[in-house]
Curated annotation (Swiss-Prot):
It comes from Arabidopsis thaliana. Belongs to the protein kinase superfamily. Ser/Thr protein kinase family. It catalyses: L-seryl-[protein] + ATP = O-phospho-L-seryl-[protein] + ADP + H(+); L-threonyl-[protein] + ATP = O-phospho-L-threonyl-[protein] + ADP + H(+). The active site is at D773 (proton acceptor). This is LRR receptor-like serine/threonine-protein kinase ERECTA. Residues 648-918 form the Protein kinase domain.
Length: 976
């Protein structure tokens, strides 16, 4: 008995020693893996060799309860750099490896194929390169292989078909080439195949439908050719079929109607022929997108049977015939886009039954007849575009019922009659375009009640009467075009209240009076009042000097400073007889003035505070106080600043904007500062403004410009900032130095720095701060071309208790969030939109708004034919080694500028994506762990595998890890 007990004890001790040996080896393996990482934020601080350290409690490590073998390694979204160590193959018991959302580079090690128990491998959203190793095919237990959003090259290994349990294969957004291996189509358990955004060629194999369990098939944005297989109707398990943005030709096969997919995306190919009527039998369709092809014939009336379809995109084809009235039966329809075809006939009144319709676009067709009153029953209609047709009749007065409408474009038709007063009751309208019609009568003064209006175009009509003074109430307006009408009378004085207006076109009318009422419109950049009957002097102050003579020609009585202007004509000498009484009055007045001068000379002299930058205009206000916030400004007083800048003389001006002028001042210590003089002399709440400035003075970040001092006065407020010698990003891109080559690495560094500064304001300040005016001119550059945001938080700090919104300041045209017009609120996502426009500027070296073109609209117009990369600045293509990264930054910019704020990423997410693009030899500066995502916001987009019938395609874009997942999808969903 004792002998048996001893044997058992020895066996137990042996097992313990064996377990201790194994566990010791696994801990050493983990430390070996750590050596290959560059732990920027020291997130793996607990991975140490300390004797008391238990690797099973290390961050991201999970162990089996009995053997203590490592079974899961989850290091996702930790900002890890470096490579994946070959030592990972020594962890034989691993069931799951999740390294997604880092900045890992190098190749996937062949040794990963030694993890024989592995079921889940997710290396997505990194910078991994090289081929997909064939050794992965040895992982016979593997169920999920997710390698999307890397830089993998080469063909897809056909040996992946040898993994018997593989359910998810996601290789999207890489640089894979070659054809799709036909053997993959014979994997009966495969449920999800994501291959979008690669360089795959060849045809779509008829064997596709051998994948009897496949519900998600996505090959969007490749270079696939040939036709859609005739047998496609046999793929009865499909829920999502996306073949868009390839080079597919031929007709849409009849058998496609046997599919029961929720999403059918065929847009952006070269498909021809007619739309098969059998598509009208696909009752499960939620999204049908056939746009951007060569489809002809008429729209099948049977599509009206699709009562569960929410989005119908047939635009940019060659469709003819009329719009079927049966479309009015699609009761769930939200988006109906039929624009850019050859449709004829009328808009059927049956469309008025679509009470959930959000967007109706029939622009650029040959439609005629009146615009039906029945559309006023579409009470949720947000956007109506009928531009470029042959519509006649009058503007329906019933449109006043469309209270949700923000965009109304009736331009370039044959519409007659007056502008109905009822339009002024569409309170949320931000764009009203009635141009190029035959509208007559006067402009209703009640249009001045449209407080959210951003753009109004009534040009090229037969409008008479005057410009309503009520237009002065359009405080949000940015563009007004009344040109080429018969408008008379003066330019109303009330227009000087339009502090946000950028464009004003009044040419070719019969206006009289002068242009002095526009002198205070400081943000005005496009002005044309030519060919009217205006008289008087053109103002020389403020911003009128920027306008060319062409803006004023054709006004014989208008006096300007250009050649041949009446100002330069020889003027007749006018003889005036002066009475003795007048001479006596002048003499007495002169004596009084002389007496006042003598009294003033006897008083103690103090340096006068500035007024309009003049040295000879003393005023009676007391000297303002200079509040010092930085040691750089120590020992300075207000009088010092006035003396050093000669009372803010014009010769010290280094820039100006819509609300301020910026001066350069060299301090006593020979260090320069930038002085921003605000135009507003009477802040509504000086005390509140001072409180905000005190708060802003505490904000310090390497990518933010520091506030060094301030001076508040009813004469005008001064803000003192760091002076940055390289000026603004706008100067670098569009200013006198724009001929200078700007390489890709520098652009990426600037984009990353600006994003870090904005992310700090949004996520690390308490209370959080909305910038409200993100634009290239508010991104300054230091001597190393490091980006630093300026002008942040001046208006109002973000109030967390009020839904993080504020309406105090509007942004700049071209950069402003379109959602602002509907809500009158700016949020963090408004800053994200503006930042996206800045990214587009960096990528194209084009201005956000240039003359009458809009950069975002221009980019969007190039997306349908995959021509976006053609917009890239040539300096990028000549200095960037990997144009795939440029394409991804385009994707990121389009994500930032999505119309719906909830679809945009956060600035933390933006910084993480841009950080992943930075060159490994020049890593970005480390950020605090608080500046990274506190926890993974990743939403498992494959979670519907067990219940494929419940797939919700829209939810797939909600994942934090999908910030730049699908180039084509970003384009198609970024509707204007």
């Amino acid at each position: 008995m004792a002998l048996f007990r001893d044997i058992v004890l020895l066996g137990f001790l042996f097992c313990l020693s064996l377990v201790a040996t194994v566990t010791s080896e696994e801990g050493a393996t983990l430390l070996e893996i750590k050596k290959s990482f560059k732990d920027v934020n020291n997130v793996l601080y607990d991975w140490t060799t300390s004797p008391s350290s238990d690797y099973c409690v290390w961050r991201g490590v999970s162990c089996e309860n009995v053997t203590f073998n490592v079974v899961a390694l989850n290091l996702s979204d930790l900002n890890l750099d470096g490579e994946i160590s070959p030592a990972i193959g020594d962890l034989k018991s691993l069931l799951s490896i999740d390294l997604r959302g880092n900045r890992l580079s190098g190749q996937i090690p062949d040794e990963i194929g030694d993890c024989s128990s592995l079921q889940n491998l997710d290396l997505s959203f990194n910078e991994l390169s090289g081929d997909i190793p064939f050794s992965i095919s040895k992982l016979k237990q593997l169920e999920q292989l997710i390698l999307k959003n890397n830089q993998l090259i080469g063909p897809i290994p056909s040996t992946l078909s040898q993994i018997p349990n593989l359910k998810i294969l996601d290789l999207a957004q890489n640089k894979l080439s070659g054809e799709i291996p036909r053997l993959i189509y014979w994997n009966e358990v495969l449920q999800y195949l994501g291959l979008r955004g690669n360089n795959l060629v060849g045809n779509i194999s008829p064997d596709l439908c051998q994948l009897t369990g496949l519900w998600y098939f996505d090959v969007r944005n490749n270079s696939l050719t040939g036709s859609i297989p005739e047998t496609i109707g046999n793929c009865t398990a499909f829920q999502v079929l996306d073949l868009s943005y390839n080079q597919l030709t031929g007709e849409i096969p009849f058998d496609i109607g046997f599919l029961q997919v929720a999403t059918l995306s065929l847009q952006g190919n070269q498909l021809s022929g007619k739309i098969p009527s059998v598509i009208g039998l696909m009752q499960a369709l939620a999204v049908l997108d056939l746009s951007g092809n060569l489809l002809s014939g008429s729209i099948p009336p049977i599509l009206g049977n699709l009562t569960f379809t929410e989005k119908l995109y047939l635009h940019s084809n060659k469709l003819t015939g009329s719009i079927p009235p049966e479309l009015g039966n699609m009761s769930k329809l939200h988006y109906l886009e039929l624009n850019d075809n050859h449709l004829t006939g009328h808009i059927p009144p049956e469309l008025g039954k679509l009470t959930d319709l959000f967007d109706l676009n029939v622009a650029n067709n040959d439609l005629e007849g009146p615009i039906p009153d029945h559309l006023s029953s579409c009470t949720n209609l947000n956007s109506l575009n009928v531009h470029g047709n042959k519509f006649s009749g009058t503007i329906p007065r019933a449109f006043q019922k469309l209270e949700s409408m923000t965009y109304l474009n009736l331009s370039s038709n044959n519409i007659k009659g007056p502008i109905p007063v009822e339009l002024s009751r569409i309170g949320n309208l931000d764009t009203l375009d009635l141009s190029n019609n035959k509208i007559n009568g006067i402009i209703p003064s009640s249009l001045g009640d449209l407080e959210h209006l951003l753009k109004m175009n009534l040009s090229r009509n037969h409008i008479t009467g005057v410009v309503p003074g009520d237009f002065g109430n359009l405080r949000s307006i940015m563009e007004i075009d009344l040109s080429n009408n018969d408008i008379s009378g003066p330019i109303p004085e009330e227009l000087n209240q339009l502090q946000n207006i950028i464009l004003l076109r009044l040419e070719n009318n019969n206006l009289t009076g002068n242009v002095g009422s526009l002198a205070n419109c400081l943000s005005l950049t496009v002005l044309n009042v030519s060919h009217n009957n205006l008289v008087g002097d053109i103002p020389k102050n403020n911003n009128f000097s920027r306008f060319s003579p062409d803006s004023f020609i054709g006004n014989p009585g208008l006096c300007g400073s250009w050649l041949n202007s009446p100002c330069h004509d020889s003027r007749r000498t006018v003889r005036v007889s002066i009475s003795r009484a007048a001479i006596l009055g002048i003499a007495i007045g002169g004596l009084v003035i002389l007496l006042m001068v003598l009294i003033a000379a006897c008083r103690p002299h103090n340096p006068p505070p500035f007024l309009d930058g003049s040295l000879d205009k003393p005023v009676t206000y007391s000297t303002p106080k200079l509040v010092i916030l930085h040691m750089n400004m120590a020992l300075h007083v207000y009088e010092d600043i006035m003396r050093m800048t000669e009372n803010l003389s014009e010769k010290y001006i280094i820039g100006h904007g819509a609300s301020s002028t910026v001066y350069k001042c060299v301090l006593k210590n020979c260090k320069p500062v930038a002085i921003k003089r605000l135009y507003s002399h009477n802040p509504q709440s000086m005390k509140q403004f001072e409180t905000e400035l005190e708060m802003l003075s505490s904000i310090k970040h390497r990518n933010l410009v520091s506030l060094q001092a301030y001076s508040l006065s009813h004469l005008g407020s001064l803000l003192f900032y760091d002076y940055l010698e390289n000026g603004s990003l706008w100067d670098l891109l569009h200013g006198p130095t724009k001929k200078k080559t700007l390489d890709w690495d520098t652009r990426l560094k600037i984009a990353y720095g600006a994003a870090q500064g904005l992310a700090y304001l949004h996520h690390d300040c308490s209370p959080r701060i909305i910038h409200r005016d993100v634009k290239s001119s508010n991104i300054l550059l230091d001597k190393d071309l490091e980006a630093r945001l300026t002008d942040f938080g001046i208006a109002k700090s973000l109030c967390v208790s009020k839904s993080h919104t504020s309406t105090y300041v509007m942004g700049t045209i071209g950069y402003i969030d379109p959602e602002y017009a509907r809500t009158s609120r700016l949020t963090e996502k408004s800053d994200v939109y503006s930042y996206g426009i800045v990214l587009l500027e960096l990528l194209t070296r084009r201005k956000a708004v240039d003359d009458e073109s809009n950069l975002h609209h221009l980019i969007m117009s190039k997306t349908g034919n995959n021509e976006v990369m053609e917009m890239a600045d040539p300096d990028i293509t000549s200095t960037c080694k990997d144009l795939g990264v440029v394409k991804k930054v385009f994707q990121l910019a389009l994500l930032c500028t999505k119309r719906q704020p909830n679809d945009r990423p956060t600035m933390h997410q933006v910084t993480r994506v841009l950080g992943s693009f930075m060159l490994s030899e020049q890593p970005p500066a480390a950020t605090d762990t608080s500046a990274t995502l506190a926890g993974s916001c990743y939403v498992d987009e494959y979670a519907n595998l067990k219940t494929p019938h419940s797939v919700n395609c829209s939810s797939m874009s909600a994942s934090d890890a999908q910030l730049f997942l699908r180039f084509g999808q970003v384009i198609s969903q970024n509707s204007e």
